[in-house]
Amino acid sequence: MEDFVRQCFNPMIVELAEKAMKEYGEDPKIETNKFAAICTHLEVCFMYSDFHFIDERGESTIVESSDPNALLKHRFEIIEGRDRTMAWTVVNSICNTTGVEKPKFLPDLYDYKENRFIEIGVTRREVHTYYLEKANKIKSEKTHIHIFSFTGEEMATKADYTLDEESRARIKTRLYTIRQEMASRGLWDSFVNPREAKRQLKKDLKSLEPCAGLPTKVSHRTSPALKTLEPMWMDSNRTAALRASFLKCQKK
């Protein structure tokens, strides 16, 4: 999976994901599914913002090639991918300038046209289920939620999808391509199926010497980027397996 991530995603995205994980003691070489999920989420956030500007009349416009004579402002402020301190600095600046309510959790984007923060979700599960989880966590009608899935489904607050259909289609196509590329390498099942991941984890653990390299403590810290992602079942399975193996070693 790590090799796939480095081949599939832009080096800048990979670097941002690595920094986010390492800052919180997570190793991209071990937490490879999480590594892939963070990179995917970052790319969707960047694609959401790509080519969208506001002209001198305040109207939203799409420009795919830069025109030095055009008086354009980026429609979206990208918050995701920044370190927490800088991200909150950007959020506070936006709130002070626009008067919008400060969110309790770091959002992913700010839309200068609609004057609202946006929370982007990318899920391997049912979009409605994940949308409700996001809404229950945020508990604010001020933050707009937009969920995408790897199957081409999407869901947004009040069915307001913010972007034009073509822009959203680019994101859906990219997610579908990622899924297909994972599947062609035999990675998709372990990325999306908890049982398969658990089976593989047990197999990997059996190949290790008893107690060798097993941690006595498990970190429960969550990286900034993952606060925008769905709960990663891989973490709980790995934690449970390591704990069980460690207890067996203690008894011996």
UniProtKB/Swiss-Prot annotation:
The active site is at 80, 108. InterPro entries: PA/PA-X, PA/PA-X_sf. It is found in: Host cytoplasm; Host nucleus. The record marks 202-203, 206 as: Important for efficient shutoff activity. The record marks 195, 198-199 as: Important for efficient shutoff activity and nuclear localization. GO terms for molecular function: RNA binding. It comes from the Viruses. It holds the Pfam family Flu_PA. GO terms for biological process: viral RNA genome replication; viral translational frameshifting. Keywords: Decay of host mRNAs by virus, Eukaryotic host gene expression shutoff by virus, Host cytoplasm, Host gene expression shutoff by virus, Host mRNA suppression by virus, Host nucleus, Host-virus interaction. Belongs to the influenza viruses PA-X family. The probable endonuclease active site in the N-terminus and the basic amino acid cluster in the C-terminus are important for the shutoff activity. The C-terminus acts as a nuclear localization signal. The C-terminus is recruited to host protein complexes involved in nuclear Pol II RNA processing. Plays a major role in the shutoff of the host protein expression by cleaving mRNAs probably via an endonuclease activity. This host shutoff allows the virus to escape from the host antiviral response. Hijacks host RNA splicing machinery to selectively target host RNAs containing introns for destruction. This may explain the preferential degradation of RNAs that have undergone co- or post-transcriptional processing. This is Protein PA-X. It comes from Influenza A virus (strain A/Chicken/Hong Kong/715.5/2001 H5N1 genotype E). The gene is PA.
